[in-house]
């Protein structure tokens, strides 16, 4: 997908969202019913395999090329004391990723998947949303295009993750702006390790929402979002335009895509939500977008960890779909 020249192009793309192949989906459902098992007995694994058939336009979907994209950014709102860790940890963790020492490195190695780390202007945090917009239109466009550029059109699957001290505060602010309700219901601890920090986050978000009042989806992303959130938005949009399925990680990734959902409620139909984070707002956000997570493992790490674990569920679905024999091929009697 080519980079955007202006934000208004997004509205044109939303009107042209490609859809899964319904004919293939129907054939895939019938194919599943011919495999040597009671119909529906593999549960969500069957749904996943049919999902991939529809998006890949084939009865034999594959995952030969998987991209795991981790976007990193820093946030001006950290100046408000919403975190227990200094912002320098973002750069330090990016270095840890590059040196192979993080959880996501081990999960990618275990799954034989290449990991791409994409830091975005870490020495220049976004503006503090407590006082005004995080970004202007030019900055937002640059970051969205970074996400778009990261998606390889030959990929079979995109796994998304993030790193950024302060971005759970950003995710809560975006979610509240998108769907409303009590701020406290959207705010979890993140890396805040005491009640005072949690209260501080709620107070900061309340003020930030009053200062940044615009509720049009792209304005929400621009005024309240971070650079990594904008890049995730861009990568998600690019994947949709290329009909590439996506596995989303936790709360921050989901919140990054929420403005896209508001633009068109079907815009995330190519996305699998890998898990439900322990972050308080994630369960509510998934419900607001009518999405069901594959896993619930009490994970709240970020960095794509939950999504990468979910990848193994997806792979299990496809190996069963592609490898199982049919009743007819092995002479086993089917149900009547």
Please report, for each region that a protein language model flagged, where it lies by residue:
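N-terminal loops that bind phosphate or other acidic moieties
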Residues: 2-336
């Amino acid at each position: 997908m080519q980079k955007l020249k202006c934000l208004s192009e997004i509205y044109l793309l939303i009107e042209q969202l490609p859809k899964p192949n319904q004919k293939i989906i129907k054939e895939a459902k019938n194919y599943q019913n011919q495999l040597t098992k009671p119909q529906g007995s593999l549960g969500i694994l069957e749904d996943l395999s049919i999902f991939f058939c529809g998006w890949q336009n084939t009865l034999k979907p594959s995952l030969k090329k998987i991209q795991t994209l981790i976007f990193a950014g820093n946030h001006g709102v950290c100046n408000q004391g919403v975190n227990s860790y200094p912002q320098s940890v973002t750069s330090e963790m990016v270095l840890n990723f590059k040196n192979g020492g993080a959880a996501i490195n081990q999960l990618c190695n275990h799954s034989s998947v290449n990991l791409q780390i994409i830091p975005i202007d870490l020495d220049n945090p976004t503006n503090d949303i407590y006082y005004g917009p995080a970004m202007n239109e030019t900055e937002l466009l640059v970051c969205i295009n970074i996400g778009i550029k990261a998606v390889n059109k030959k990929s079979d699957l995109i796994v998304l993750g993030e790193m950024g001290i302060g971005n759970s505060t950003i995710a809560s602010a975006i979610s509240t702006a998108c769907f409303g309700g009590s701020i406290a219901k959207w705010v979890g601890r993140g890396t805040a390790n005491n009640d005072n920090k949690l209260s501080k986050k709620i107070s900061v978000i309340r003020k930030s929402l009053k200062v940044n009042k615009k509720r049009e989806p792209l304005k929400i992303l621009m005024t309240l979002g971070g650079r990594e959130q904008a890049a995730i938005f861009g990568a998600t949009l690019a994947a949709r335009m290329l009909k590439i399925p996506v596995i989303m990680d936790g709360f921050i990734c989901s919140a990054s895509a929420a403005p896209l959902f508001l633009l068109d409620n079907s815009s995330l139909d190519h996305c699998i939500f890998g898990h439900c984070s322990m972050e308080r707002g994630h369960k509510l956000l998934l419900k607001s977008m009518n999405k069901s997570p594959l896993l619930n493992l009490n994970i709240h790490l970020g960095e794509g960890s939950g999504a990468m674990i979910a990848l193994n569920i997806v792979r299990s679905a496809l190996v069963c779909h592609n490898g199982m024999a049919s009743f007819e091929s092995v002479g086993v009697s089917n149900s009547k």
